[in-house]
Amino acid sequence: MSEVSNEAARRRTFAIISHPDAGKTTLTEKLLLFGGAIQMAGSVKGRKAARHATSDWMALEKERGISVTSSVMQFPYEGKIVNLLDTPGHADFGEDTYRVLTAVDSALMVIDVAKGVEERTIKLMEVCRLRDTPIMTFINKLDREGKNPIDLLDEVETVLGIQCAPVTWPIGMGQRLKGVVHLISGEVHLYEQGRNFTRQDSTIFPSLEAPGLVEKIGEQMLAELREELELVQGASNPFDLDAYRAGQQTPVFFGSGVNNFGVQPLLDFFVEHAPPPQARETTGRRVEPTEAKLSGFVFKIQANMDPQHRDRVAFMRVCSGKFTAGMKTLHVRSGKDVKLANALTFMASDREIAAEAWPGDVIGIHNHGTISIGDTFTEGESLSFTGIPNFAPELFRRARLRDPLKLKQLQKGLAQLSEEGATQFFRPLMSNDLILGAVGVLQFDVVAYRLKDEYGVDAIFEPVSVTTARWVHCDNAKKLEEFREKNAGNLGIDAAGQLVYLAPTRVNLQLAQERAPDVRFSATREHAHVKAID
């Protein structure tokens, strides 16, 4: 096996998805704790608490206790290298999450035992479906009262349309929680207050028949458990690796992230069965991870990861080959050679200079405004990874300055923050307005907060008469020019220099489409095909 094949086979790159407050960030912390990446897990709850969760590193996230931007963390575990991408749980940040899901090989879905499948989980699941992403499920907060576990499996199967294969099963819950049974190994992991629940610090019985177990959980509970397990094993599906990897079956685990309980069986199973880096489609051909030459794509851009340095970092997923510090690459969109000198690896916000990276790894590239989401880097081959879209925003606001002298900083701030992809920035052709588009209201708050915090600009966002946006294309240059002249009042340019129709109403959009049958109006923009406009 080549060095690239060897290293690629060790990688497990995944994202955690959930509805807000299902305990995703807490679980992230615990996985890092087991991976030896952090010594002391910080709880997300107390906003003024001294320890903040490692993956919520932006000032606003620390203040509000919600994850707003996806973090990237890497840790070694059992001979494998795990790359964990945390995604925002808040509904308004769907696009950021969507793009993170394009950069992973599998996902972990976290469900609150009391709430079951929630609306945001359904949406994220649809995204995973588009790519047949393999999914494992962790049913969290077992230390609280919740729904019947059998009903929960039924709910996941019915609502999300995916087969469940329970791997661990709870022994009671809430006040009566006694532990979990591992349905494949037969082991019983006891739940005891004050334990860390590492392999070294937990009571594990080899089976339900093991002497001493009945004293721990009581005869009645053991009898109930045996009955329940008979029912579960009769009604549910055994784990099937091929069905899981095809995105048709989800292995299910139960536990309590905040208490570390049930997390290690999940992590052990994950590193053993989750897929290593997979082949990727490009505009020209399929790229296999084991190819010798480097290729990768940018799925996220983050401004100001380090307030002291006012920097912007492009997150690149390595798809094939080996990255080494200082290597020369081709930035396909611009056609320029770029030397990747100080690329970073991540442990949430702690960055280290990357000496090398392999397929499945995520590295950070310093970006001075020349790199966009969806950009491909190669060792010279001209190809572009596909399937990384920009969506048309659903809400629009005009930015207004309280201090008109800060216009330059405002333009710079809006352009840089929109590069991250959670908001989009438009400039109408016929006015000096600066219009911001987003998927949800929270994003405008975040931008206003960050403009003030990071750029020293006090701006307010007020309503503007734009209902929706469509990217416009036409193969006939003359017809496009005619369309541009007739509709100049409704046209604008986005941050990538693409022409966009900003429709004041849905009816207006319909009429414009009818009047210009040769012009294509699209609700998404595929990043792979965007060429830079000078």
UniProtKB/Swiss-Prot annotation:
GO terms for cellular component: cytosol. One of its GO terms (biological process) is regulation of translational termination. Increases the formation of ribosomal termination complexes and stimulates activities of RF-1 and RF-2. It binds guanine nucleotides and has strong preference for UGA stop codons. It may interact directly with the ribosome. The stimulation of RF-1 and RF-2 is significantly reduced by GTP and GDP, but not by GMP. Keywords: Cytoplasm, GTP-binding, Nucleotide-binding, Protein biosynthesis. It is found in: Cytoplasm. It comes from the Bacteria. GTP binds at residues 18-25, 86-90, 140-143. This is Peptide chain release factor 3. Residues 9-278 form the tr-type G domain. The gene is prfC. Its main location: cytoplasm.
